[in-house]
Structure formats: C-alpha cells, structure tokens
Amino acid sequence: MRRTSATLRGRARPRWRAGNTTPVPVNQTGTCAQLHPPPQGTLQVVRGDGTSLGTVLIFHCPSGHQMVGSGLLTCAWNGSTVDWSSGSPVCKAVPPHETFGFKVAVIASIVSCAIILLMSMAFLTCCLLKCVQKNERRRADRTAQLWYQLRGEDLETVQAAYLGLKGHNHNNSSSVGGGNGGPSGGGGKPGIQHSQAHDNHSFTTDPGDIREQAGVTHSVDKDPWTFRMGTPGPGGCSSSPGTYVMVHALNSAGLAPGNPGRPKVYLPG
C-alpha cells in the first residue's frame, strides 16, 4: 500500500523543466472575453475565432476620429490566466480647430499659385505688347523716311525741269523781242505766249501735284489761272518781269471739261 501511494503521488506532482522558471499551466483550454467594436469604429478578426487563445484583432476608426489605445490586440497568457494584450481602444472625434490650420495652409498655397500664374501671364503680355509697338514704330519710321525721300526726289525733278524750261522761255522771248523791234515793243508779247504755250506742252506733272499747286497759286494771285513771273512765288523765288510760265497737263481725253479754252493749272515760280 505504501508503494502504491508513493507512485500515485509521484505521478500527481508536476515536473519542472531544467532552465525554465515559469511552470507550464495545467489549463490549456482558456479563452478571452468577447470584445465589441468601439463606437463609430470597426473590428477585424485577423486570426482565430475572436475569443480563443491566439486570436488577433485589429480596430479601425473613421475619418475625423482618432484612435485612443492600441489598435492591435492578441489573446494570450497573462500569468496564470488568459487575457487580451491590452484594453479595447476608443475612437475619439477630432475637434474642428485642429484641422483649421491645415485648411488655411492649403487655401493659402492655392491662392499664391494663382497669383504667381496671373503675374507671369501679365509679364508675358506686357513683353509681347512692347515688342509689337516697337515693330510698329520702326515700320512707321521707315515709311515716313521713304515718303520724305521720294518727296524730295520729286521736288528736285520738278525744280530741275522748271529751271530748264524757264531758261528756254527766256531765250525765246529775247529772240522774238529782238526780231519785233526790241524788248519794249508792243508786238513781241503774242509771239512770246505762243512759243511758251508750244514749248510747255511737253512738260507734264502728276495730277495730285497739279491740284496742290493750283491751291497755292489761288492764294497768291487773284486770277488762279495766271501767275506772273515778276511776283514772288510760294518758294520765295522770283524771275524776270513780264514773263508768264504756263504748265499744261496732258490728258488722253483732251482739255478739262467745262473749260476748253484755258489750261488746267500754272506752275508757280
């Protein structure tokens, strides 16, 4: 009987492993308490059935909320009992003033980007306008310079032709006057006018210049169709007295309508 009781006692005693200070629990079928998701949060079972030993749970909170506590819980031994690794977390709402600074920063960055873009566009527009205005100014200067050059060449041509015509008419008047009894004779004037009219048929000018010169002669003399060479002309020059210079503009249709007997204009001296 004594040997039998000693054997039973030896079997009932727990055996200790060498190098291990924690005894192996006798109860290997422990479970953890059932957990529920926090208010306005969710619960996800990653491993296990939610209460058995070795179960892993993950908690989630929606946007605008902050989790207070650990979001990962595990069912494990805690000493001689089975319990969760930490307490159940809570989802706490984030106050609005905490997100106000972030919103202000985002709005300020957007506004600054828009201002930079507008300033860049304004700068580019001003540069383009300046380039266009500079090109237009150069073109206008070139046009004006060319117009003045052409105008000066036309004036030199007209003056050269007029000076040559005046010398030729003076020679004709001298020759005709000498043949009719001298320059003071009364019979020399018709011959002078005839030779002048005959010689001036070969001298033509632009109709626009004719109209401009006709307006000038009208302001100088009472008769717009005659201009005496003894009087000073618009250019300030005068010629010998008693000589008339007539300029006829040749037209393919003949003389001007309504005034067949008179020339269109006289060239002033």
UniProtKB/Swiss-Prot annotation:
Any one of the GO CC terms: plasma membrane
Residue ranges annotated as Cytoplasmic topological domain: 125-269
Keywords: Cell membrane, Disulfide bond, Membrane, Sushi, Transmembrane, Transmembrane helix
Phylogenetic classification of the source organism: Eukaryota, Metazoa, Chordata, Craniata, Vertebrata
Domain of life the protein comes from: Eukaryota
Region Disordered: start-end pairs: 1-23, 171-237
Pfam families xrefs: Sushi
Species of the source: Mus musculus (Mouse)
Disulfide bonds, paired cysteine numbers: 32-75, 61-91
PROSITE patterns associated with the record: SUSHI (PS50923)
Transmembrane region(s): 104-124
Protein name per its UniProtKB record: Sushi domain-containing protein 3
Start and end residues of each Sushi domain: 30-93
Main subcellular localisation: membrane
Subcellular location: Cell membrane
Biased composition (Gly residues): 176-190
Membrane-protein topology: Single-pass membrane protein
Sequence ranges on the Extracellular membrane side: 1-103
